[in-house]
């Protein structure tokens, strides 16, 4: 039977206590500002919040969970159903360094204005997006995002992040690792 012919699960009654494990209230979500190679850089300060999924990636240590080691251990809704959902919360001028994923990564601003960038060097591109706009990056595309909201320097804004797969992998670009090394050398 092909995927197109696959039968739907039989409908059953879901008790409230069962469904309560699949409900997350934004006000109760907990995130982390640690767990990624660029977490300590001042321009990368951000809180990542794991709502659904983000199992730790399997395999080599050069790959990290897109939401960081801390967050991959604490989803609000602990399911593995082919996608992951989280939020990034940060102030203007903040966001991750360029990185890549092994699956699709889609962004949708909830609040504020965000710049989504892709490629490095001569091929660099970007687009500015606002609430409910959507940018969907394919695997193998170096990408990053940054809060660019004006006139609110101390206000954290929220970006929705959806990433395909059960245990997606992220890897920072060589240029990003050079910036991390430079920062670490200056801290020594």
Language model regions located:
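A structural connector/turn signal
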Residues: 85, 95, 104, 124, ...
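A short, N-terminal "cap"/entry segment at the start of jelly-roll beta-barrel domains
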Residues: 1-81, 188
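Glycine- and acidic-residue-biased ligand/ion/polar-headgroup-sensing regions
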Residues: 92, 103-115, 120
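Histidine-centered metal-chelating micro-motifs
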Residues: 94-97, 115, 133-135, 139-145
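Double-stranded beta-helix
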Residues: 2-18, 142-188
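Conserved short histidine dyad/triad with adjacent acidic residue
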Residues: 66-73, 84-101, 139
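Short histidine-centered beta-strand/loop micro-motifs
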Residues: 74-78, 96-101, 118, 126-128, ...
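Short acidic-glycine-tyrosine-enriched beta hairpin
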Residues: 108, 120-139
């Amino acid at each position: 039977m092909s995927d197109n012919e696959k039968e739907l699960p039989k409908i059953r009654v879901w008790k409230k206590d069962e469904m309560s494990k699949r409900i997350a209230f934004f006000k109760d979500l907990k995130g982390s500002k640690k767990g990624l190679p660029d977490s300590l850089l001042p321009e990368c300060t951000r809180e990542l919040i794991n709502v659904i999924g983000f199992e730790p990636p399997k395999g080599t240590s050069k790959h990290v969970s897109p939401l960081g080691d801390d967050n991959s251990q604490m989803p609000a809704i602990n399911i593995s159903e082919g996608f992951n959902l989280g939020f990034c919360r940060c102030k203007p001028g903040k966001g991750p360094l360029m990185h890549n994923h092994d699956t699709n990564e889609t962004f949708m601003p909830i609040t504020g204005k965000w710049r989504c960038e892709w490629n490095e060097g001569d091929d660099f591109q970007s687009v500015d997006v606002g609430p409910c706009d959507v940018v969907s990056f394919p695997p193998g595309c170096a990408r990053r995002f940054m809060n660019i909201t004006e006139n609110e320097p101390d206000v954290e804004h929220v970006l929705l992040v959806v990433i395909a797969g059960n245990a997606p992998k992220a890897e920072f670009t060589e240029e990003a690792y050079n910036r991390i090394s430079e920062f670490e050398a200056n801290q020594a």
